[in-house]
Regions:
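Small/polar/charged residue-enriched interaction surfaces, especially the RNA/DNA-contacting tracks
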Residues: 1-216
């Protein structure tokens, strides 16, 4: 079997937290790079992404304050996503091509077994204390909103085979929390006109504009 769904010891299908976190981070990274396209300090892989000593997290390039870096655990915590409804398994055979002859490489054929439209549920937790420790501005909430909106609209993928139409997703998001940030985030994701035209969101936009322009 070349590729199959991941299961726990009891046989339960799940999405590992690492896979969900990685997919979310990759989507957010694309957004960040688009916004900061003309600032190599915020985009380059050689930018400040090492927090080896105490308080170094405050000096990190903006993106890494939110998604973690060497010596700095990301303020976003993700749990394993569990399957909540039975889903049909669909096997598929893949043909391997010999790169020298252009013909079928029989011994290298492989098979995948995927789930058809499975539904998973899990939690993201944003640690506001860690955001504060990194001196991350309110822009982090807007970047989260952008990324969650993409997932709500089906723009994203998780796992193997995106080019083969595997891993597509369409998310549903429910925001819990009583902080002002949670209320605004709920409003953005719910297209609340009052929130979208509110002063709090204007502040987030200005904070993001400032963050992507910083020399880290």
């Amino acid at each position: 079997m070349g590729h199959c769904t991941i299961r726990k010891e009891d046989g339960a299908v799940y999405l590992p937290a690492e896979s969900v976190r990685g997919a979310f981070r990759a989507q957010a990274r694309r957004i960040w790079q688009t916004l900061a396209w003309d600032n190599h300090h915020q985009n380059a892989k050689t930018g400040n992404q090492n927090a080896a000593r105490k308080d170094d997290q405050k000096k990190l390039a903006g993106f890494f304050k939110l998604f973690g870096a060497t010596g700095w655990r990301a303020p976003i915590e993700v749990e394993d996503f569990r399957l909540v409804e039975a889903a049909e398994e669909r096997p598929q055979e893949f043909v391997a091509i010999d790169r020298f002859t252009g013909g079928v490489a029989g011994p290298k054929k492989f098979k995948a077994v995927a789930l058809w439209k499975p539904k998973f549920v899990g939690d993201f937790t944003v640690r506001t204390d860690r955001l504060g420790a990194a001196n991350a501005g309110s822009w982090v909430w807007l970047l989260l909103a952008f990324t969650l909106r993409d997932w709500l609209e089906g723009d994203g993928s998780i796992g193997f085979g995106r080019s083969k139409n595997y891993g597509g997703l369409e998310a549903k998001v429910e925001v819990f929390g009583t902080t002002p940030e949670a209320a605004v985030l709920r409003g953005i994701l719910g297209s609340d006109g009052g929130v979208l035209n509110g002063a709090e969101l204007v502040g987030w936009v200005r904070s993001l504009e400032s963050a992507i322009g910083e020399v880290a």
